[in-house]
Amino acid sequence: MAEAIVSVTVQKLGQLLLEEPLFLFGIGDQVKQLQDELKRLNCFLKDADEKQHESERVRNWVAGIREASYDAEDILEAFFLKAESRKQKGMKRVLRRLACILNEAVSLHSVGSEIREITSRLSKIAASMLDFGIKESMGREGLSLSDSLREQRQSFPYVVEHNLVGLEQSLEKLVNDLVSGGEKLRVTSICGMGGLGKTTLAKQIFHHHKVRRHFDRFAWVYVSQDCRRRHVWQDIFLNLSYKDENQRILSLRDEQLGEELHRFLKRNKCLIVLDDIWGKDAWDCLKHVFPHETGSEIILTTRNKEVALYADPRGVLHEPQLLTCEESWELLEKISLSGRENIEPMLVKKMEEIGKQIVVRCGGLPLAITVLGGLLATKSTWNEWQRVCENIKSYVSNGGSSNGSKNMLVADVLCLSYEYLPPHVKQCFLYFAHYPEDYEVHVGTLVSYCIAEGMVMPVKHTEAGTTVEDVGQDYLEELVKRSMVMVGRRDIVTSEVMTCRMHDLMREVCLQKAKQESFVQVIDSRDQDEAEAFISLSTNTSRRISVQLHGGAEEHHIKSLSQVSFRKMKLLRVLDLEGAQIEGGKLPDDVGDLIHLRNLSVRLTNVKELTSSIGNLKLMITLDLFVKGQLYIPNQLWDFPVGKCNPRDLLAMTSLRRLSINLSSQNTDFVVVSSLSKVLKRLRGLTINVPCEPMLPPVDVTQLVSAFTNLCELELFLKLEKLPGEQSFSSDLGALRLWQCGLVDDPFMVLEKLPNLKILQLFEGSFVGSKLCCSKNLENLEEWTVEDGAMMRLVTVELKCCNKLKSVPEGTRFLKNLQEVEIGNRTKAFKDKLISGGEDFYKVQHVPCVVFENCEL
């Protein structure tokens, strides 16, 4: 990873030399020498990074280079911030100005000395590395990182998420057992060591068509070592209930929550998966909501067989076995050679020989095989496969697996997969160390943090319209393809990963590497009490700190935050306090001493006032102020607009991807926004909100909508009455959301001509007509949402030829005036969901007439 850090530092030094020569007056030569030395050392780092696991001496040299790069950035940043601060104070008196000049001269001399000292350190490391035999790389061959990532995205589809080898017979047996259960609660346990495929098997059962038909409701909850009863119960209830119940469920007291969930499970036939439950005590604190007399069933995954037998001694216990050599190669082949049909048979045979040598080192563990398969999928030649094989033999034998245990073996394989990551993707991987076990990470936030810290390198040569956010997404996709992170949710329209999480074994590797690289300090409240954890931060030189509270800590105020001296943590670059309850509702004043801070989040905290010292944070890139109540913003935040925004201000935001804008009903605003289309060529999501006043006429958005030709998502909150013609919409439009539009005419006359529409959401007041006919040309429609109050006058619905639509809308149950639903040309499975006893029958049971036309029998 040092290679990526040095590259960023070299780039920043180059920008300073080019853009700030006056600031560097007197020390420019020293800065240039430092840049040259870093460039030279960067040529050694590829070989050094690969040899770190073999030699502690090499590890120390790499760490020294990394720290020297950080130190150089910190020194120059601090100097420029101090100089800029003096400049802004505008000293007028001659003596004070003279003192300022003398101070700057002293500072320059001091900075120059520190830069020379860093350069000297690096020169000594370079000499030592040469003597040790570290090889110098004169440049990377082949594609650039961004190009290779993009090429792999096209040639390596998301096959990893669906592979199932060695579990086929177990799957069918467990599914049949599950759907043949009686009227008493039964627990099906999948038990085995980490990396054996327990969660993979549970997911296959959870989504099996027989299971989906048998049960009415479904819930999947990650439990993990830190089992918090309220959170688990809430997650189960939220999964099982309708979205309009969410706020009420979240407001329930613990006792009410347990009672209501118990009644719900007794009334309904539900399937609940408790993934990764660790101990008997966790089962004891959760089990009270599960009624004995019920058609519901529970699947739990655990590493502890005692937990499985304790939960239900008479239940179904399944213990997946290690893969055989043949099964191991089958899984590796599926992942590593997927999409390579054009490879010569002789090369495939050679790769198979190497692959079979490689899987022997995996000991039959599916996780290790899957991760290595993802690694080999990035290698296209026999020589590259052979090199991986040699490194595996070396790494596994020397990597600490002397006891031969499977856990140590898989840990070695996962560590090797990290070493093979491209340098900048390594930093993205290590950022997962910030998050607790089994945490579902929002990718947008993760990517924005990596961008803000300079971890995502700008792309010089790439296709038009590609942004730095796209490159960040590519980094994340690379981790997905290598099975180093697991996808939570994908965007239906764009297929981008929206949320993801990390397997706990992979997370252990992530934490280990993050510690080795001094990347982040993780404070875990299970290791020391809360106050000591926070106070310990005051003596640390970390640039990133993750405070992870456990054991109900979320219900208490963080009383020790005021004891932390941020003044001693000046190197900190990210401070994320999301969800914390801070005593007094105010951050300490010495937050302003964190002069290198790039990211500060007080999201969903009780902070009511920002300290005035926040104005000192000149390098701030991301400031998240989405708090629970009102927030006082001090006037130290210069040029921080808190009033209305002029649409013309958007003309400078040429890379904007999503825009939500509130307009008056005046045509001038529409003309201005329409003109933005000439500049906002990368806009993918647009939300337009116009006040719906009774006396005002409907809005004509034809010109505005047709101006943006690349939109993938469009949301309209306005009085419309009639949709624009199909020619007005972007051909890429995949999602359309309508609020308060008052549509009278059937919108499907237009919507059926939009070829890529996948999501249609109709909210309150969006349609006031009496008939909807969805009859043709909507083959790609996958999701259709109808909210309560959306179509109160609707009498008839026709659904035909929407072959990808998974079911009728959830909100169909709100359409009290609905008299007829006609469904045509659909599968038997779709039909079975809607007939009496079917999974979705509750949606249409109030409709007098449900007609199935030309459906499978």
Curated annotation (Swiss-Prot):
LRR repeats lie at residues 653-678, 680-703, 754-780, 791-816. Gene3D superfamilies: 1.20.5.4130, Helical domain of apoptotic protease-activating factors, P-loop containing nucleotide triphosphate hydrolases, Ribonuclease Inhibitor, Winged helix-like DNA-binding domain superfamily/Winged helix DNA-binding domain. Pfam families: LRR_14, NB-ARC, Rx_N, WH_DRP. Keywords: ATP-binding, Coiled coil, Leucine-rich repeat, Nucleotide-binding, Plant defense, Repeat. GO terms for biological process: defense response; response to other organism. Residues 27-60 form a coiled coil. Residues 148-461 form the NB-ARC domain. It comes from the Eukaryota. SUPFAM superfamilies: L domain-like, P-loop containing nucleoside triphosphate hydrolases. One of its GO terms (molecular function) is ATP binding. ATP binds at residues 192-199. The LRR repeats probably act as specificity determinant of pathogen recognition. Belongs to the disease resistance NB-LRR family. This is Putative disease resistance protein At1g50180. It comes from Arabidopsis thaliana.
